[in-house]
A protein has these predicted regions:
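Short, charged/polar, low-complexity loop and linker segments
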Residues: 108-126, 142-155, 162
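Non-transmembrane, amphipathic alpha-helical segments
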Residues: 32-35, 39, 120-131, 155, ...
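Intrinsically disordered, low-complexity acidic/proline-rich regions
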Residues: 1-24
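Helix-boundary capping/turn motifs
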Residues: 15-18, 39-45, 134-138
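Charged, amphipathic alpha-helical oligomerization/scaffolding segments
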Residues: 127, 131-134, 138-141, 145, ...
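Long, charged all-alpha helical bundle/coiled-coil segments in cytosolic proteins
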Residues: 24-110
Length: 186
């Protein structure tokens, strides 16, 4: 966690490769079977950021990752059924928290856990997607329910309500997206 949190400073000072190259091969010795899926996803986020910072954190991209990060990252990725890359899931969906836990997800209540350069632009670029995903949740659930209705040949009166949920949620997502220029200019 400390190393992943240090990425912006390590990139700024061109020390990311030096620090990673000098890690003990066993610096990550967690028994992954004793961790929850959320914890494993967090490990994946951390290693994804470390690996990509290592590769792109110097004038010339690195072509090989040190085993101190590549071996655990591969194990973690395999457990999650994902390739070892910094995917949308790792960069966005598994990489945020609410600032105030008992408040709704909103543009003013979401923050990144990890980033590359610790800038407001990077945070905003990712957190807007968290809010859009949250706003779209009801439409996705309604769409899945509609698909199930068609699959079961049991279309009923509730179908029109599901369509209205999709439309309503789509409008919420559009509103969230439209606030981007306002917030980005701050």
């Amino acid at each position: 966690d400390q190393l992943a949190n240090s990425i912006p400073k390590l990139l700024l000072t061109n020390k990311i490769r030096y620090v990673v190259d000098n890690l003990d091969k066993s610096f990550f010795s967690h028994d992954l079977t004793s961790h929850s899926e959320a914890e494993i996803k967090l490990f994946n986020v951390q290693f994804s950021f470390l690996a990509h910072a290592y590769v792109w954190g110097d004038e010339n991209p690195a072509t090989v990752l040190p085993s101190s990060i590549s071996v655990p990252w591969k194990k973690i990725s395999d457990l999650l059924g994902r390739p070892p890359i910094l995917s949308y899931g790792s960069y966005c969906l598994d990489n945020w928290h609410k600032i105030v836990d008992d408040e709704e997800i909103s543009l003013d209540n979401v923050a990144l856990n990890y980033n590359f350069l610790a800038g407001i632009d990077e945070d905003w670029f990712v957190t807007i997607h968290v809010c859009i995903e949250d706003a779209a949740r009801e439409a996705i659930l309604a769409t899945l329910s509609i698909a199930d209705s068609f699959a079961d040949d049991s279309i009923n009166e509730d179908l029109s309500q599901k369509y209205l949920e999709v439309i309503s949620t789509s409008m919420t997502v559009s509103y969230t997206h439209l606030t981007l220029p306002t917030k980005a200019s701050v």
